[in-house]
């Protein structure tokens, strides 16, 4: 689905410094727009034979871990909303559990809300993603059918 120019801006927010910078910089450029601050959380994977071992007491721990991840995702999204509002955007949180790759979830949410554009930092929280253009941002760039803004942080933390 192609983007609607009047749709909200979709800010992808995971709490990383890159995501914070993206909201601050892009929010300043696009102030007064309606924005959704999306936090995608991933469920705890049930690995290998453990998932089929019948150890239901341990599976309850996975449910608790997923519940905690969902709650944490909500807090992260709320933090992103506060940043977006501070940058002049009319923002609301969206928190969702990934049913597959995070980039697919981002595109699905952008489509379902007819987002005018997707805005994200270049790298996320993981050490591996800091080595490259983040795999999520790279996949979104290549698969999104709407404008996508990837905001890079200055290499010198003191530079603006």
Residue spans of the language-model regions?
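Small/aliphatic-rich secondary-structure junction motif
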Residues: 2-60, 89
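A short acidic, glycine-rich active-site loop
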Residues: 58-75
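Short, solvent-exposed amphipathic alpha-helices that sit
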Residues: 25, 72-80, 105
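Short, hinge-like loop/turn segments at secondary-structure boundaries
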Residues: 53-56, 110-112, 136-137
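Structural beta-alpha unit
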Residues: 1-4, 79-118, 156-160
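Solvent-exposed polar/charged
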Residues: 28, 111-112, 142
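General small-molecule cofactor/ligand-binding pocket signal
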Residues: 36-38, 92-96, 149
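Glycine-rich, Arg-bearing micro-motifs that act as flexible, cationic patches
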Residues: 2-6, 103, 117-139, 143, ...
């Amino acid at each position: 689905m192609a983007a609607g120019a009047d749709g909200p801006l979709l800010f992808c927010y995971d709490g990383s410094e890159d995501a914070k910078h993206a909201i601050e910089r892009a929010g300043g450029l696009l102030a007064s727009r309606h924005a959704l601050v999306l936090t995608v959380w991933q469920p705890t994977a049930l690995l290998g034979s453990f998932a089929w071992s019948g150890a239901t007491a341990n599976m309850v721990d996975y449910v608790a871990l997923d519940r905690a991840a969902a709650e944490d995702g909500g807090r992260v999204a709320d933090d992103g909303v506060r940043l977006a509002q501070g940058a002049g955007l009319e923002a609301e949180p969206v928190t969702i559990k990934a049913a597959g790759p995070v980039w697919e979830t981002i595109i699905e949410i952008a489509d379902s809300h007819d987002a005018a554009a997707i805005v994200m930092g270049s790298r996320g929280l993981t050490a591996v993603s800091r080595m490259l253009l983040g795999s999520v941002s790279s996949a979104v760039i290549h698969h999104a059918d709407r404008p996508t803004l990837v905001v890079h942080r200055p290499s010198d933390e003191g530079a603006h």
